[in-house]
């Protein structure tokens, strides 16, 4: 018999630990452990796999773990030239980006939420079958494994709400007549309402999970197919990929996964700069940035509405109705309809604002020289869309005017679902008020947290300290603006970087060699470790967005 057989005490102990770990631990710690584990595993596998050729020097361990963390947190901060990785390493980085993407991790959240509801439904069912043959009454207390903890996925942060449940009949329930007698004469608690509620939540959560999984799969398959067809049809774009020794299929799946996860890694050293004269490819890649991030709630609602119309399933309509009323199953990507409309409008306005400023300031710049007006317009739109939060670039950011760079910094700092809402929905107001009244202890800890701006200021100061010698010797490359861009880019999990150029050195160094890496790729060990902390902080920023409330500045 297996040591984990369902009838053994060891299985019960394992089940209890499983429930405590997944349903009792705070989501912050669960997600932090998840990203740390994936990053460490990715580093070990990157180190074990061979580089592209034997002529390519093996990177330092710190650069490999930096790359693994960057892929897992979908930050795309480059410390190793991408073309030095072998095909197997590129596929591994693709897997890391897939596992770290927001949509994929939300599917995992739905899976565990569904498991929680299923366990709750089983725990609240009458146990007639378990005691039917013995004539014995059900036990008066429940086992530790039946104590469930609700793992909610609601904004502004994931909160654990502890709701112990029991199937035992309390003395007060018997006194008030709330108990019932079954056919064997034993008194037990009426569980029909809670069981029905758990069953309904289980059904809708499972359905939503399958919808998001289908959305995830369809977008990736469609994007992969479109890029492969484009590379085959347009010889120039295919020649660029083939000339770099990259398989067209690897390039397609890598780019689609990276763009949809909003990571921003591209398997070429130059990124998308190599394809700025191919607007068709840019237009194929661009929608995946929106589908996987800022407009994901919009297209998710459209997908559910389309499926409801095609299938006629009432459960799909119930999902939309609940979210329209401010309720739902706690899946914070499924926003109410009014908020979704304002989100789409906000995204469009921000993109247009960036497009207008970029065209006004950079239309005749060296980075766009030699391109047609249409290619320039598509390139400007591509940069505007990628500033939130993918980070793929079609020109060197160090050559862009300071005004545009500052605007990009603001865009990188904004959370993906930043929305201008001139009229507050009454259901949202009611929910916020009730939440404030019911979670006083939680709000105290929230107020004690520092605001994101405070944390970023501390990180910038720390990096200025660790890189103080380079700031003094190489002030143009190591300007404070470049450091701010790198830190905010890591926090926003974007990947924009001004890079490093030997030509910008005040004191030319004959041993300096230009590499296709980000600016942080030239930092010291302490600076890289600090930036990795920023990447983790940015990936988990939803837990601290409302920090700093204890400060009163008047």
UniProtKB/Swiss-Prot annotation:
Name the record gives this protein: Cation transporter HKT1;5
Entry's Gene Ontology BP terms: inorganic cation transmembrane transport; sodium ion transport
Keywords tagged on the record: Ion transport, Membrane, Sodium, Sodium transport, Stress response, Transmembrane, Transmembrane helix, Transport
Location in the cell: Membrane
Effect noted on mutating residue 395 to V: In strain: cv. Nona Bokra and cv. Pokkali; higher sodium transport activity
InterPro entries named among the record's database cross-references: Cat_transpt, TrkH_K-transport
Keyword set includes Hydrolase: no
Induction: By salt stress in roots.
Sample GO molecular function, one term: monoatomic cation transmembrane transporter activity
Free-text comment on this protein's domains from its UniProt entry: HKT transporters are proposed to contain 4 pore-forming regions enclosed by transmembrane segments with each containing a potassium channel-like selectivity filter motif.
Keyword hit for Cell inner membrane: no
Xref: Pfam families: TrkH
């Amino acid at each position: 018999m297996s040591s984990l057989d369902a009838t053994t005490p060891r299985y019960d102990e394992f089940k209890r630990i499983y429930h405590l770990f997944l349903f009792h631990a705070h989501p912050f710690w669960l997600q932090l452990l998840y990203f740390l584990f994936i990053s460490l595993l990715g580093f070990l596998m990157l180190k074990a796999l061979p580089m592209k050729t034997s002529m390519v020097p093996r990177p330092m361990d710190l650069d490999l773990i930096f790359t693994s963390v960057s892929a897992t947190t979908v930050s795309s901060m480059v410390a190793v030239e991408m073309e030095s990785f072998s095909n197997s390493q590129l596929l591994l980085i693709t897997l890391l980006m897939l596992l770290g993407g927001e949509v994929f991790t939300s599917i995992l959240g739905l899976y565990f939420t569904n498991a929680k509801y299923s366990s709750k439904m089983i725990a609240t069912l009458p146990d007639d079958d378990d005691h039917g043959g013995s004539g014995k009454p059900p036990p008066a207390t429940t086992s530790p494994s039946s104590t469930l903890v609700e793992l909610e996925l609601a904004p502004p942060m994931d909160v654990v709400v502890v709701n112990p449940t029991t199937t035992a009949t309390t003395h007060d329930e018997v006194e008030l007549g709330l108990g019932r007698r079954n056919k064997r004469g034993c008194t037990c608690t009426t569980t029909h309402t809670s069981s029905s509620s758990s069953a309904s939540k289980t059904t809708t959560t499972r359905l939503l999970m399958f919808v998001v999984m289908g959305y995830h799969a369809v977008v990736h398959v469609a994007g992969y197919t479109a890029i492969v067809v484009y590379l085959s049809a347009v010889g120039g774009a295919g020649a660029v990929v083939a000339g770099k020794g990259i398989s067209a299929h690897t390039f397609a799946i890598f780019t689609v996964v990276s763009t949809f996860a909003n990571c921003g890694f591209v398997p070429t050293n130059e990124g998308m700069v190599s394809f700025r004269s191919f607007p068709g490819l840019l237009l194929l890649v661009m929608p995946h940035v929106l589908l996987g991030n800022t407009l994901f709630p919009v297209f998710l609602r459209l997908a559910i509405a389309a499926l409801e119309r095609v299938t006629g399933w009432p459960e799909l309509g119930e999902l939309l109705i609940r979210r329209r009323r401010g309720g739902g199953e706690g899946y914070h990507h499924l926003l109410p309809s009014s908020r979704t409309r304002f989100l789409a409008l906000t995204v469009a306005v921000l993109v247009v604002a960036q497009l207008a400023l970029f065209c006004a300031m950079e239309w005749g710049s060296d980075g766009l020289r030699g391109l047609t007006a249409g290619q320039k317009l598509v390139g400007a739109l591509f940069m505007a869309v990628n500033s939130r939060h993918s980070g793929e670039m079609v020109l060197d950011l160090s050559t862009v005017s300071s005004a545009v760079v500052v605007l990009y910094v603001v865009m990188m700092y904004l959370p993906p679902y930043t929305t201008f809402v001139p009229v507050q929905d009454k259901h949202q107001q009611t929910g916020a008020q009730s939440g404030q009244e019911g979670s006083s202890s939680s709000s105290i800890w929230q107020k004690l947290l520092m605001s994101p701006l405070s944390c970023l200021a501390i990180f910038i100061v720390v990096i200025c300290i660790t890189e103080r010698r380079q700031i003094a010797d190489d002030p143009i490359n190591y300007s404070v603006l470049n450091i701010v861009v790198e830190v905010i880019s890591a926090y926003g999990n974007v990947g924009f970087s001004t890079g490093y150029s030997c030509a910008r050195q005040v004191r030319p160094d004959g041993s300096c060699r230009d590499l296709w890496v980000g600016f942080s790729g030239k930092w010291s060990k302490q600076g890289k470790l600090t930036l990795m902390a920023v990447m983790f902080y940015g990936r988990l920023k939803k837990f601290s967005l409302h920090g700093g409330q204890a400060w009163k500045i008047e």
